[in-house]
Amino acid sequence: MQSVGHAFKDALTAGSELAVIAEVKRKSPSAGELRPEIGAAETAIEYVRGGASCISVLTEGPRFGGSPEDLKAVKLAVDAPVLRKDFLTTPQHIHDASAMGADAVLLIVEDIGSVAEVADLQDLALSLGMDALTEVRAEHDLEMAAEAGAYMIAVNQRDNPKDTRFTVDHDKAVRMAGLLAELGPEIVTVAASGIETPDGTKLRDLAGVGYDAALIGEALVLSDSPAKRLQTMLNTLG
């Protein structure tokens, strides 16, 4: 693995408490319209004010209401590292993320399909000065991610939409924590989906089983005051 800057990874591991990646999204396939009117830059500023370590920006339009312009606007508005969240499966997608100014890209094992391709896309991202966050949904995905040399792994608690219509398993991240720990303390671990929603997984529970960070979208987007909502979440860790 090449020795390059890791602004995104470093931001997630800089403190002693669990970090938050706050997500900018206007809608989702599971929930429909969330806040279609929000501005990406203004939302990101609120997130950082509330204590977000990093920002995730959806750049996919039809299903999530995002765009590359959202990511560019966020990069201009905040100093926090920015993740491009999209269905990235080709080298061109990674080059596009770099051109947008992303500090990190999301690599979804299930969508990419092979260990070799995951490894190649991660290496490409690193060569362009970006981090790679590798997403897994199941134990099989985790095995592939480890074989590909993933150094940041996100457990998505939302199941395969082909089978379950985006059902969220709120215990999945906690259940998989032991498997992640077996990969070694150098792996940066992230929990995603269903975090701090009304019936969702709590930050304190994720911190208790060793996660480094949580990616939170819906619970913040739907809040009238994202900064205060995030501060309240983070205060539960103290």
What are these regions (language model features)?
Residues 99-116, 154-165, 209-230:
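Glycine-rich phosphate-binding active-site loops on the catalytic face of alpha/beta enzymes
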Residues 22, 47, 55, 97, ...:
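Conserved, mostly hydrophobic/aromatic
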Residues 19, 32-133, 141, 173-177:
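N-terminal active-site wall of soluble small-molecule enzyme domains
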Residues 51-52, 77-80, 99-105, 126-130, ...:
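Glycine-enriched alpha-helix->loop->beta-strand junction motifs that scaffold or abut catalytic
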Residues 89-101, 137-149, 188-216, 228-229:
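Catalytic cores of alpha/beta
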Residues 172-179, 204-207, 220-238:
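C-terminal helical cap(s) of enzyme catalytic domains, especially alpha/beta-barrels
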Residues 23-27, 60, 87, 110, ...:
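Active-site beta-loop-alpha junctions enriched in small/polar residues
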Residues 1-34:
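N-terminal amphipathic alpha-helix/helix-capping segment at the start of soluble metabolic enzymes
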